[in-house]
């Protein structure tokens, strides 16, 4: 399970080094194999261990190619999907189209989301945190039935 937010840097070749605390679990549990794709609702990337991504693909197979919304989702998620492997130094090479989609600059944030990571441009992440705070204060948040029994 992946949790926490880590500041990371992109090098001039478009590589990011995964923080050391995640490298061993990724290597042992997932053979260092990942799939990177785009988030269809935010300007960030999603990094899934290959086994977790296989579950997503099984769901995508059930979607129709004739319904515009379902086809659009498949196009985005599968069209940008890039299979990769951590190198010996724990780095991933991010293809240019993915870096462009997320507007990634030199400084980025890798954010654990249990079964996957989000990869954000650092400035965009700070903006997203502010938006999330506002959402939590919103009346709709308080009325959300799925969150009614959630407590910390």
Swiss-Prot record:
Keywords: Cytoplasm, DNA-binding, Repeat, Transcription, Transcription regulation. GO terms for biological process: negative regulation of DNA-templated transcription initiation. Gene3D superfamilies: Transcriptional regulator MraZ domain. It holds the Pfam family MraZ. One of its GO terms (molecular function) is transcription cis-regulatory region binding. Residues 5-52, 81-124 form the SpoVT-AbrB domain. GO terms for cellular component: cytoplasm; nucleoid. InterPro entries: MraZ (IPR003444), MraZ_C (IPR035644), MraZ_dom (IPR020603), MraZ_N (IPR035642), MraZ_sf (IPR038619), SpoVT-AbrB_dom (IPR007159), SpoVT-AbrB_sf (IPR037914). PANTHER family: TRANSCRIPTIONAL REGULATOR MRAZ. Belongs to the MraZ family. This is Transcriptional regulator MraZ. It comes from Shewanella woodyi (strain ATCC 51908 / MS32). The gene is mraZ.
């Amino acid at each position: 399970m992946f949790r926490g937010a880590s500041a990371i840097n992109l090098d001039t070749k478009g590589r990011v080094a995964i923080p050391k605390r995640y490298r061993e679990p990724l290597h042992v549990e997932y053979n260092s194999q990942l799939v990177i794709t785009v988030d269809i609702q935010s300007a960030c990337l999603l990094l899934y261990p290959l086994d977790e991504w296989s579950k997503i693909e099984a769901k995508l197979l059930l979607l129709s190619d004739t319904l515009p919304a379902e086809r659009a989702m498949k196009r985005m998620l599968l069209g940008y999907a890039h299979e990769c492997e951590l190198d010996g130094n724990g780095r991933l090479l991010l293809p240019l189209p993915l870096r462009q989609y997320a507007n990634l600059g030199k400084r980025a944030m890798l954010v654990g989301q249990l079964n996957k990571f989000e990869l954000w441009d650092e400035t965009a992440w700070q903006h997203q945190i502010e938006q999330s705070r506002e959402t939590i204060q919103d009346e709709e948040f308080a009325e959300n039935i799925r969150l009614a029994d959630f407590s910390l």
